[in-house]
UniProtKB/Swiss-Prot annotation:
One of its GO terms (cellular component) is large ribosomal subunit. One of the primary rRNA binding proteins. Required for association of the 30S and 50S subunits to form the 70S ribosome, for tRNA binding and peptide bond formation. It has been suggested to have peptidyltransferase activity; this is somewhat controversial. Makes several contacts with the 16S rRNA in the 70S ribosome. Part of the 50S ribosomal subunit. Forms a bridge to the 30S subunit in the 70S ribosome. The keyword rRNA processing does not apply. Belongs to the universal ribosomal protein uL2 family. Pfam families: Ribosomal_L2, Ribosomal_L2_C. The keyword RNA-binding applies. GO terms for biological process: cytoplasmic translation. This is Large ribosomal subunit protein uL2. Keywords: Ribonucleoprotein, Ribosomal protein, RNA-binding, rRNA-binding. Residues 255-279 have a biased composition (Basic residues).
C-alpha cells in the first residue's frame, strides 16, 4: 500500500492524502458480525458531557473482532480483506473448515487465500497464527497481546505496530512494546505472530477540518480565548499570556505533568517508556 495524493481542485483537497485501498476485497461484510453501537457523543447516562470535543461522527457499524483467538486446532482461510471504520488497520474475514466465520486484525504479509491457525500448544511461526507467548521464539514480532489469560488481546492492535519478544523469566515473557517500554506478560497469554498491517496509516494527512468531524472529533477552543469564568487562562486585554503554568479547565497541571496512578501491575514494567525530550 502507498499514500495517495489528489489534485488540488479545492483548497481542502490540496494537502488531502489517503492510503490506497487496492488490498480491500469488494465484497459485502458479514451481517451477523455487524452491530450498531449507540453514539454517546461524550455524554453520560444523565446527558452531561463527560468527555469534551466528541460527537457522533459519520454513521458506521461495528465489526465484531475475534481478539481472543480461542478457536484452537481448526484451520481457517482468509476470505476477504475489509475496511473497518472503527480502527486504523484492515480486518480479515476468516472462514474456518467447520463453516464458522470470524474477523481478525489483518497482519502485515497476510493475503486472501492464506491459511492460518490458532493453538495453545504452538503452531508454525508465520503471520496470522496465534499461540501462547511461552511457545513463541525469542526475537519474534507479535501483536494483539493479552494482559489477562483468556480475556482477549488488549495491547499492540494499532496499524503498523508490533512488540518483540526479548526473553523469558520463569512464568513470564519479557516484551519490548512499540513505545520502547519493557514489560513482563504471563507466558500463558495469547498473542498473534507478525505486525499489524496498514503501516502507512501514520503518514496520512487529514487535509481538512471536515475529515476530523467525520471521525467524531469536535473543534477545541483555546483556554486563552475564553473568559475568566470559563478557563483559568481566560481574560485579559487582547492577546495575553495566561500568567501561570498551563492547567486544565479545572486547574490541574497539564502539558507534561504525570497523572498516571500507581498500580499493582507496575512491578511488571521493567523499563518505562521514553518521555518526550521536548517537555
Amino acid at each position: 500500500m502507498a499514500i495517495k495524493s489528489y489534485k488540488p481542485t479545492t483548497p481542502s483537497r490540496r494537502f488531502y492524502t489517503n492510503v490506497e485501498n487496492n488490498d480491500i476485497t469488494s465484497k459485502p461484510s458479514v451481517r451477523s458480525l455487524l452491530v450498531k453501537l449507540p453514539a454517546s457523543a461524550g455524554r453520560n447516562n444523565n446527558g452531561r458531557i463527560t468527555s469534551r470535543h466528541r460527537e457522533a461522527g459519520a454513521k458506521k457499524l461495528y465489526r465484531i473482532i475475534d481478539f481472543k483467538r480461542d478457536k484452537f486446532g481448526i484451520a481457517g482461510t482468509v476470505s476477504t480483506v475489509e475496511y473497518d471504520p472503527y480502527r486504523n488497520c484492515r480486518i480479515a474475514l476468516i472462514t474456518y473448515v467447520d463453516g464458522e466465520k470470524r474477523y481478525i486484525l489483518l497482519p502485515k504479509g497476510l493475503n486472501v487465500g492464506d491459511a492460518i491457525i490458532a493453538d495453545a500448544t504452538g503452531v508454525d511461526i508465520k503471520p496470522g497464527n496465534a499461540m501462547k507467548l511461552m511457545n513463541i521464539p525469542v526475537g519474534t514480532s507479535v501483536h494483539n497481546i493479552e494482559l489477562k489469560v483468556g480475556k482477549g488481546g488488549q495491547m499492540v492492535r494499532s496499524a503498523g505496530t508490533s512488540a518483540q519478544i526479548m526473553g523469558r523469566d520463569g512464568k513470564y515473557v519479557s516484551l519490548r512494546m512499540p513505545s520502547s517500554e519493557m514489560r513482563l506478560v504471563l507466558g500463558e497469554c495469547m498473542a498473534t505472530v507478525g505486525a499489524v498491517g496498514n503501516e502507512e496509516y501514520i503518514n496520512i494527512v487529514l487535509g481538512k477540518a471536515g475529515r476530523t468531524r467525520h471521525m467524531g472529533i469536535r473543534p477545541q477552543t483555546r483556554g486563552s480565548a475564553m473568559n475568566p469564568i470559563d478557563h483559568p487562562h481566560g481574560g485579559g486585554e487582547g492577546k495575553t499570556n495566561s500568567g501561570r503554568h498551563p492547567v486544565t479547565p479545572w486547574g490541574k497541571p497539564t502539558k507534561g505533568s504525570k497523572t498516571r496512578r500507581k498500580k499493582a501491575s507496575d512491578k511488571l514494567i521493567i523499563t518505562r517508556r521514553k518521555s518526550n525530550p521536548k517537555r
